[in-house]
Amino acid sequence: MKTSHYLKKASAVCMAAAMMTGCASGSSGTNGKTLTVGLNTGFNGIFSPLYYQTVYDDYVIEMVYQSMLSYDRDNQLQPELATEQPTISEDGSTLTFKLKKGVKFSDGSKLDADDVVLTFTAMADPSYTGRFSTYVDYLEGYKEYHEGDAKTLSGVEKIDDYTVAFHLATPRIDAISQVGTFP
């Protein structure tokens, strides 16, 4: 019974990841030219940000998916799907991101806080077999949710339709980067 519940949840996560393909703010940059990229090896073909394993697949992911923050040419974090840098609570235990409005998935549905919560909750799920559980294992409630003792991951909170808070159980110097740059 429990396995069936997790399989349903994993299927929902995979569908959400597939819907993230083409997530963009609506502007398009078509100039009619072709970009040719040379690689010394082939792709594995796993283009899900939750499950890819090679840098070559990541090259494709970086061109298709966006994150709340991204690095600019000077290696500084800049808002991408977020409207601004996250706010940090006085004690450093909560990071709050505000999402841009009007961002749509390739199917036309809007990106909102529920999508962010779903993505990070998926990485904490016991059935998750990808390699990014370290992106959430320092959030409040991770252990309880991962072990099936809680129904939700309390460390990821929807504040409103376009605001998400991440509550850290353990301090992490790289928390803004890890949370902010994950697609």
Q: Where are the model-predicted features located?
A:
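Short, low-complexity disordered leader/linker segments with a strong preference
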Residues: 1-35, 76
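Short, well-ordered beta-strand elements
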Residues: 31-41, 94-97, 116-119, 164-166
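Extracytoplasmic
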Residues: 32-34, 63, 80-82, 90-94, ...
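N-terminal lobe/hinge region of extracytoplasmic solute-binding protein
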Residues: 38-90
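Solvent-exposed loop/turn segments at secondary-structure junctions
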Residues: 41-45, 75, 102-104, 123, ...
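Extracytoplasmic/secreted proteins, especially bacterial periplasmic and envelope-associated proteins
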Residues: 59-63, 67, 72, 76, ...
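Aromatic- and charge-enriched surface segment that lines or borders ligand/interaction sites
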Residues: 84-135
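Surface-exposed binding/hinge segments that line
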Residues: 98, 133-183
